[in-house]
Amino acid sequence: MIKDEFKPVKDIIKSVEGICDEKIIVITGNKRVKESGDCKILYFPWHDDYSTPLNAGLRLCESDWVLRMDSDEEIDEINLKRVQKAVTLRDDVWAYEVCQRGYLPQKRVEFGVKLVPEHKGYTNAVDDRCIRLFRNDPRVFFEFNTHETLYNSLERARLRYVKSNIVIHHWGKLNMKDKASYYYELAKDRARRHPEDMQSYYYLGVSAEFIGKIEESYQAFLAGYKKYRNEYYRVPMEHLKRKRRSTNGRIN
């Protein structure tokens, strides 16, 4: 899915054409773009919701499996081979979790940042588990306006998903400065509309921390921990508690 520029996806198209039977591009901008290649193109108006255009794109798919990638991502040869192996490995699996490795500037400090094997000069990253490889099945679809997910639909349909060793390289965090406030507003809206979803407080906390709203981030993780009492919220809550102290009492 891209906004209004076809160029960023050309490298993705080139990298996957050896294993993909079809390529579908969803364009959410308000103008036509210069297209190239043998891709199916869907123009879909943007309305502050990532799931809806992605689901519209899924309806164009005819292949048995879907590999979903964004314009600020890439997949290397090693992981393409892992994708090829995964789709032929098990008949009882409907989807695979991958590692979305989001690279960051070396001095960036926030929850989840760690050292990773060097890739194109970067060793600082956040690893997020998400489902990007899944069967083309009408029971499997994206939900939520931001940090769109397939987990809920898979679980409702009782379809099995498993972890994989597939890594997708993500460069979007390097250029988040202009978009971070917008993503924060989307995360607030998701938490307001879906307070019952376990991940809503988490993504609000992550988005708030990224733009320096430390107190709001802490309160989001704290609210999630009080509600669910699990490690998913306890660990980032403790991280933000320490970060609050390091601000010498300054509250954002």
Residues of each region from the PLM?
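Acidic donor-binding segment of Leloir-type glycosyltransferases
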Residues: I13-Y43
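Start-of-helix register in tetratricopeptide repeats
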Residues: Q199, Y232-H239
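Conserved donor nucleotide-binding strand/loop of the catalytic core
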Residues: E35-T52, A56, L60
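Catalytic-site signature of metal-activated, phosphate-bearing donor transferases
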Residues: S51-L58, W65, M69, I75-E216
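Residue-level signature for tetratricopeptide repeat
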Residues: S207, L240-K243, T247
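Short, well-formed alpha-helical segments that are part of the catalytic scaffolds
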Residues: M1-I19
